[in-house]
Regions:
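Short C-terminal tail/terminal secondary-structure segment
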Residues: 152, 237-238, 249-265
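Residue(s) in the substrate-gating loop at a strand-loop-helix junction
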Residues: 147
Length: 265
């Protein structure tokens, strides 16, 4: 008996290419290991295929789907395809996100709008299509992946990303209250500094490609002395997706090794 037997999980940003575990890949694989059928969505076929193949190799059930979740028509088609394949959606994981550097002065309006689309609008669109399904089923769990950048300054000039992730948390909380009496729960997992394949790209953007130095600085910023990893995020997601958290809604689980409670940034 697994914690998610018989449930269907739609995971956006599920993909991962090459070695290492990103949040989306770890979340998708862990949900499948706990019995969920995973409808894995990513912007590229190769990224989604990598994750879905891992699930199938372990004996789980997964179907991949390619979509840009900032586009309303593609989101509607994505949800329709999931329903045609599985007939229900019990769990929605909104895991897409992207960070670009910049302050209000030097960031272009185009970059600002793109950041809002990826980090906030995507979750708005998926909720718009999935919440009526969950309500009709009598329940469901939505877990949105935010960031400590939405809670406090996180050491990098990323004003749009920070604003977007803060907005995502408020979108989650407000919608959770609206849907509480309808049996649908919405919560956020809020990762801190995580050692995932994404860190190499962040080092290029924020540390002139000095990967080792960037990683060392991030480890030192965390009170526990190290960054977390994708499995720390995935385990928090699993709890919120499962019936073990049935009385928890409109909340944030911060997974950061004490970072946001410290002054170490």
């Amino acid at each position: 008996m697994h914690r998610l037997d018989g449930k269907v999980a739609l995971v956006t940003g599920c993909g991962g290419i090459g070695l290492g575990w990103g949040n989306g890949k770890a979340i998708s694989v862990l949900l499948a290991r706990q019995g969920a059928s995973v409808f894995g969505v990513d912007l590229t076929h190769a990224a989604a295929e990598t994750t879905c193949n891992l699930i199938r190799e372990e004996g789980g059930t997964a179907q991949l789907h390619v979509a840009d979740v900032t586009r309303a028509a593609q989101v509607r088609a994505m949800v329709e395809t999931c329903m045609e394949r599985f007939g229900r959606i019990d769990i929605l994981i909104n895991n897409v996100g992207r960070s670009e550097p910049g302050s209000p002065v030097d960031m272009t309006e185009e970059t600002w709008n793109e950041q809002m689309d990826v980090n906030v609008k995507s979750a708005f669109l998926t909720c718009k299509s999935v919440l009526p399904i969950m309500e009709a089923q009598g329940g469901g769990s939505v877990v949105n992946i935010s960031s400590v950048a939405g809670l406090r300054y996180a050491g990098k000039p990323q004003v749009a990303y920070a604003a977007g992730k803060a907005a995502l948390m408020q979108l989650t909380q407000t919608t959770a209250v609206i849907y509480a009496a309808r049996g649908v729960r919405l919560n956020c997992v809020v990762p801190g500094l995580m050692l995932t394949p994404l860190v190499e790209r962040l080092a290029d953007k924020y540390a002139n490609g000095d990967f080792q130095g960037f990683v060392a600085r991030r480890h030192k910023q965390v009170p526990m002395g190290r960054m977390g990893d994708a499995w720390d995020v995935a385990n928090a997601v699993l709890f919120l997706a499962s019936d073990e958290s049935r009385y928890i809604t409109a909340q944030q689980i911060v997974v950061d090794g004490g970072l946001t409670a410290s002054t170490g940034l």
